[in-house]
Amino acid sequence: MSSQAGSEEKKKRIILIGRSTAGKTTLCQRINNEELHYYKTQTVQVINKNMIDTPGEYLERRGFRGALIVTSADADIILVVQDATAGGTMFPPLFCSMFAGKPCVGIITKADLADEEQIQRAKKYLKDAGAGTLYVTSAVTGEGVEQLVRDLNIL
């Protein structure tokens, strides 16, 4: 192995968790510089070997939450994704505590469609869920995405 290869830091593997239409798949598309288009994630998708995109039903239906825990075992960082324009949240208090001490990062999506009050409410939802660092993002405008990628070392 060359010294250069040995000195490269391993890219982090992330899992995105959030309700249906929270913007998980669209955020993955933006991170990977793909054309943005909506499609419903039906099954767990592994994108570029380091992003795990989960169906919203895994969060929305309590019976599937065990699948989130099992799927998250392959991730280095948990991303809890909250749509800034949503009137509520699916994340119960201390939701992040079920991921065995893995870093839990809060991602607020659709910032381009939200006002400041909605963004602050989304931040509260994610903090209550146990998220540490928070990022305010828009897959449409790119707001916050470059910083997220750089900070989490996911590309």
What are these regions (language model features)?
Residues A114-L155:
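Canonical P-loop GTPase G-domain recognition
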Residues S7-E9, T43-Q45, V70-D74, C96-K102:
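Conserved catalytic network of the ASCE P-loop NTPase/AAA+ motor domain
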Residues M1-T54:
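Conserved G1/Walker A P-loop phosphate-binding module
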Residues Y39, V46-D83:
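Conserved nucleotide-sensing/catalytic segment adjacent to the nucleotide-binding pocket
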Residues G66-A67, M90-F95:
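A short acidic, amphipathic alpha-helical/loop segment
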